[in-house]
Amino acid sequence: MSVGMAAPRAAFACDPDASRGRLFDELPSKTRSPFRRDCDRVIHSTGFRRLKHKTQVFVYHEGDHYRTRLTHSLEVAQIARAIARQLGLDEDLTEALALAHDLGHPPFGHAGERALDACLQRYGGFDHNAQSLRVVTALEHRYPEFNGLNLTWETLEGIVKHNGPLTDRSGAPLGRYQAHGVPTGIVEFNRCFDLELWSHASLEAQVAGIADDIAYDAHDIDDGLRAGLFGVDDLGEMPLTAQMTAAIDVRYPGLDPARRGAELVRELISFLIGAAVAEAERRLIAAQPASVQAVREAGQDLIMFAPDAAEAEALIKAFLKRHMYRHPRVMRVMDDAETVVFELFARYRDHPADLPAEWLPANAGQGETEADRLRRICNFIAGMTDRYALTEHQRLFDLTPELR
């Protein structure tokens, strides 16, 4: 199939007309499919708008041209739709999952997540996937009939399982959850709306997951180049980018550094999308899933890179870890950001009157457990933008690091 050509809807794609529905029954839309409605609800949500001022690596005032969680999510959605289109999957569901996958991230990226996880270590910790589920099922207050966005089962499943099953069929935790168990928020919601935590996710969710990796790799290279953390020639230590750069230099001799870097990022995205599609087609031919449920019960992810592309992608991640994520400038900022989150949490824990009125407990906290109380504080902080967290820290402590 030519790259970019849309395939007919596949038998293994999620069918909006066969959706497992929503937790709360609603009348169907006359003009939009259930998955299109999910996508639109995410776009119009408060949590999605806040992503504009939540960073991944750089803090918000480092520069207007660096990526935020919002721009990253939009880029993931574009890549995910491109892959879904070629595989005959439901593009609306794929887009909804791509746009929703980061809703649970706290301010300051992984630094904020580490801090909140430490603050809640005795009470289940903090997991951004569980927090994304909490946002779309409880913390959004936009509709009169229910809390959350009342998304379809397929979208909720994908938010939770886009990186693979959480348990085996017996309920034993798998992967990253083996040490501390599946997050309480996911377990509790699963009791009322079974997401089949033991099974693999739909192909649409798997596509959103690999699109996230592609976007991270390419766009963190772009941001790192813009920030001067490394140059295009430094990327020559990896065979894939060395070959791409050499080919660019032959086609465009004397190209200025900014355009040279931008062309490399474009070629990298194109290569990774093509590699993902080619391997997915190979695996789908081998597995021959006749339905979306056959995909879930395949026993393996079907959207993956082939070994050679996976090795190249792993080298990119290792390069970014050395030259960007652990760069002294970035590490210094992230250390200060963690301190801001730690101090905000401790302040609200010890002085609950400092919380906004809408975040104070109902009935003066009667019947609220300590775990519930601390989770409420966590939910408030996790919803903050970088800017609001710094402003709130300044208000409470009158001394806030500049995060530069």
Curated annotation (Swiss-Prot):
Disulfide bonds: none annotated. The keyword Hydrolase applies. SMART domains: HDc. Residues 69-217 form the HD domain. Keywords: Hydrolase. GO terms for biological process: dGTP catabolic process. Belongs to the dGTPase family. Type 2 subfamily. PANTHER family: DEOXYGUANOSINETRIPHOSPHATE TRIPHOSPHOHYDROLASE-LIKE PROTEIN, DEOXYNUCLEOSIDE TRIPHOSPHATE TRIPHOSPHOHYDROLASE. This is Deoxyguanosinetriphosphate triphosphohydrolase-like protein.
